[in-house]
Amino acid sequence: MATKKKVNVTINGVQVQVPEDYTVLLAAREAGIDIPTLCYLKDINEVAACRLCVCEAEVNGKPMRNLPTSCVLKVEDGMVVRTDTERVRKAVKMNLELILANHNRECLTCTRNQTCELQKLCHEMGIDMEWFDGETRSVCYDDLSPAIVRDSTKCVLCGRCVSACAKLQNISVLEFVNRGVNTKVAPGFGYSIKDTDCIYCGQCINVCPVAAIKEKSHIKQVWDAIQDPKKHVVVQTAPAVRAALGEEFGVTMGKAVTGKMVSALKRLGFDKVFDTNFSADLTIMEEGYEFINRVKNKGTLPMITSCSPGWIRYCEVFYPEFIPNLSTCKSPQQMFGAVAKSYYAKKEGINPKNIVCVSVMPCTAKKAECARPEMQVDGHRDVDYVLTTRELAKMINEARIMFDKLPEADPDPIMGEYTGAGVIFGATGGVMEAALRTVADVLTGKDLKDVDYEAVRGIDFFKQASVTLPIGGKDVEVKVGVVSSIAAAEKVLNAIAAGELQLHFLEVMACPGGCVHGGGQPHVSAKNRLDK
């Protein structure tokens, strides 16, 4: 790969050498200079909408007209940039104050209090008064969908959600509607989110800098169930939750806090605390046997995983011809709920109608999944309520539990035991690897060696591999693929339909990188997202 040409740029008196395709914003960060942004997301939303990243710039000794935005201004050799002048500071503060003039300022009770990027910028820029007042945009509060809530009074028109939905997922549920003071971000034609093709993945929530889009909270319902003496409340936690929950309490990003999480759940009042890995193992076993049966009996191939509810909804809406390819397995969340209200209820002598099953998931689409009409038996919902990782953190804080002081605890027995296979479900490729290991063990009685995946040129977030397994009395080269993000999945499905890609088994995760980047995980600022 050819080395990119470097250019010399001076920013606030600091000389830095960067690739010629860099923007001034990226060059400034290389030089250790933080330029404020609200709308910017690298490679996703580079539209200069907020105008908080303005600067003064000179090229060949000639000042550029007006104040260009550094997020889209390309560097040039010898360019001189200033972001610390009085003119720039005044412009940034005024633009920030204009954004605030059209913003709902209920910061103390807002769900994004202390994680709001707008709030942080106001603090950093010393905004302590409201200088502008006037006509504001019309109010739209949409809480009709089972998973996502929109609040237009908090929208800053940054466009991040529009770009994420279009570029990461290629669905484009959200768009800019109307003009001038009436401009808003919303589904077209005045539709509610629930009346669109939204898959409830929550990537729009992940990128929103404020609280204009958030998950539909189940916190009150869960508290009510815990306080009801007639209800036996059980909770399951997904693998990706333990790796992210600690971030809400100052723990290093990515560090697992399994023991403290279990301890916190018990203190919250849940009667039993279980691990979704238990049902993940069940899913792996069922999926593995189903795959063997399909290959032996010339069933529909490639078999495609059914763990990701966002992916399932996408398939149903956009690619119904692939529905026969989907595994017949319920997701681990729903499988756990079904087992909890049958096997567990019988084992413990509890009437299923008195069991409330709560899930803690990294995923907003799980809220929509548990509400699907078919996810019940004899009138009993498999899963009653779903909490995101963020919601669990709020409950822990509300209960005044000091997370860092908690002792380590283990999940309850009966459905608290599991193998290591389910643990890797949270990362892309985890479901596939676990299922293949099960298939290999069933067919050969031996452990499968590491699966060596190779990236596929032209499709981001997609990799494939091949494994030789004895199926139906002969060695079969099983071709498998792993894809995350709906935009990438669409390319893979099109390649399969066109006969350009032959696979036996395909894992699809709706969120880029898998469940660890789900729509219910702790908020990460755009700057930290870039750094990580």
What is the role of each PLM region?
Residues 2, 7-8, 15-88, 92, ...:
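Iron-sulfur-associated redox domains of electron-transfer enzymes in respiratory
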Residues 12-14, 151:
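Extended, non-catalytic structural segments that build the interaction scaffolds
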Residues 51-200, 206, 213-228, 232:
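Fe-S ferredoxin-like electron-transfer domains
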Residues 151-154, 159-162, 172, 180-212, ...:
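Unusually extended, aromatic-enriched hydrophobic runs near protein termini
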Residues 169, 208, 344-348:
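Structural motif corresponding to the C-terminal cap of alpha-helices
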